[in-house]
Amino acid sequence: CAIPLIKDCAVYRSAIIDYAINSLDTDFAKFGSLYETAGEGGTPTTSNASFYDNGKIPFVKIDDLKQKYLTENKDFITELGLQKSSAWLVPTRSILFSNGATIGEITITTYPVCTKQGILGIVPKSNIDVEFLYYFMSSTYFKKAISRIVTEGTMKTAYLKDIANILCPIPTKEKQQGIAKMPSALNSKIDYEQSLLKLFIMQKQYLLRQMFI
């Protein structure tokens, strides 16, 4: 079954990431110094059809943040919807990180996207490897730091102004790239098994529908 295998691979991957991060002997820097720009997205008014009809701009929601790389999404908005909201276009090879309600979902963009509120777009500086940043933000170290700054309210939120102050061990870019290679094989296996599981669920749903036609 794919689910236990996915869980096992995820556990091993987490252990590798944590070992690599905890073994770093390097200077610390504030998280805010690692990116060129960062910010939450926003949702265009849903009652205005001109913000959505025939839209071509990918609009990412929390359900899209399920794998290491964002390769597809379900929803789109128009250029007008982008202009009339607080959404902004997050470039390719950036990080998306959910910081509201469901906190901690993360992916790397493979094409420009905008997001709803509660999802941060993070554009790394040139001296920061996006693969390393992905794994660092997936580490127990970072998750614990996030848990300490989450505010309770109508919705749990980790605000960017607080995330920016998290101290991060940041080695040279060459070392970052070396660390990022360590869990990559397991990550590929996880993504593959998740794709198979998704296909299986779709086939099952199709067969169930056919039974009642």
Model-derived segments and spans:
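Glycine- and charge-enriched low-complexity intrinsically disordered segments
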Residues: 134-143, 151-152
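Hydrophobic structural patches
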Residues: 6, 17-21, 179-187, 212
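Face-specific signal for non-transmembrane alpha helices
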Residues: 7, 14, 184, 191, ...
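Extended amphipathic alpha-helical segments enriched in small hydrophobics
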Residues: 172-200
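A short glycine-rich beta-alpha junction/loop motif
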Residues: 52-53, 99, 113-120, 128-131, ...
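Non-catalytic DNA-recognition/assembly elements of restriction-modification systems
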Residues: 5-42, 67, 165, 169-173, ...
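Low-complexity, Lys/Gly-biased intrinsically disordered segments
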Residues: 27-67, 83-86, 152
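A short beta-sheet element
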Residues: 61-62, 72-138
